[in-house]
Amino acid sequence: MNPRGLFQDFNPSKFLIYACLLLFSVLLPLRLDGIIQWSYWAVFAPIWLWKLLVIVGASVGAGVWARNPRYRTEGEACVEFKAMLIAVGIHLLLLMFEILVCDRVERGTHFWLLVFMPLFFVSPVSVAACVWGFRHDRSLELEILCSVNILQFIFIALRLDRIIHWPWLVVFVPLWILMSFLCLVVLYYIVWSLLFLRSLDVVAEQRRTHVTMAISWITIVVPLLIFEVLLVHRLDDHNTFSYISIFIPLWLSLLTLMATTFRRKGGNHWWFGIRRDFCQFLLEVFPFLREYGNISYDLHHEDSEDAEDASVSEAPKIAPMFGKKARVVITQSPGKYVPPPPKLNIDMPD
């Protein structure tokens, strides 16, 4: 295991989002099953933490941007700052939706169509953000998720207000279409990983990468699909499972997503104005972490390392040479021993 290779591509933004969603997905079924009697404002605490960190991080980043104009010419600083502003705008609309949801569940005084109104604005904004992101090669997971689900948001709001009386299985038709596409992606990765496993022209690193991607997509999509099917049957009263048992597959998907953040490049460097990779920033703030970060473990090449150590130990040792001018001791590397050239003899004629 190489900690440096593990953390150098770490994406803290996505890790924070998945961790907050995981904690929220644990508290919500406990509240729905009546195990805890907390207010929904408390159940949504992980979501509030997520949005608070987004707002604070963007505010600090904007302050650093305004006070240091020279930073604006560093690489893609301008593109990353604009991407941060777009993400903050989408998060503010999502925060408005979540506040309205909590208020509607606690008091029940307004229509669900009004609650979902921020999501109806998020979708066109996300479409514009996707167009901009594709032009600048940005990560677009959240924007794509919000833009393709506009029809799903409308169906759910109409069903909750009892304007339509469709079963939930029909209400979630847009979601089934999206999951079908994700299943095709999983099948694509499985086929390519099998082809790479049977190919002799592919290096082991590429083969391992494709197999890992296939396993990751399987453990994300399949449990997510199981969760959605169980939830729909529970809402339609086709089963009486507890919400905790229904949410277990979702926990597996979120845990897998959290694990994938350690190998996903990306992340905006302007959050909190750090202007560098998150792990590099941590190493500068906490220098003692470098001692662990410089250690690597390789359990698969012990024999080869022993052979190398033996060859190094058998190399001839060279006595140190004393330099008169520099007054330092110079020792040649034992692994790079070069015999001295022979003395040149020139025979002069009589």
UniProtKB/Swiss-Prot annotation:
Transmembrane segment boundaries: 16-36, 41-61, 81-101, 111-131, 168-188, 211-231, 240-260
Localization per record: Membrane
UniProt xrefs under Pfam families: Tmemb_185A (PF10269)
Chief location category: membrane
Gene Ontology CC: one annotated term: membrane
Membrane topology value: Multi-pass membrane protein
Record keywords: Membrane, Transmembrane, Transmembrane helix
Family: Belongs to the TMEM185 family.
Name of protein: Transmembrane protein 185B
Gene for this chain: Tmem185b
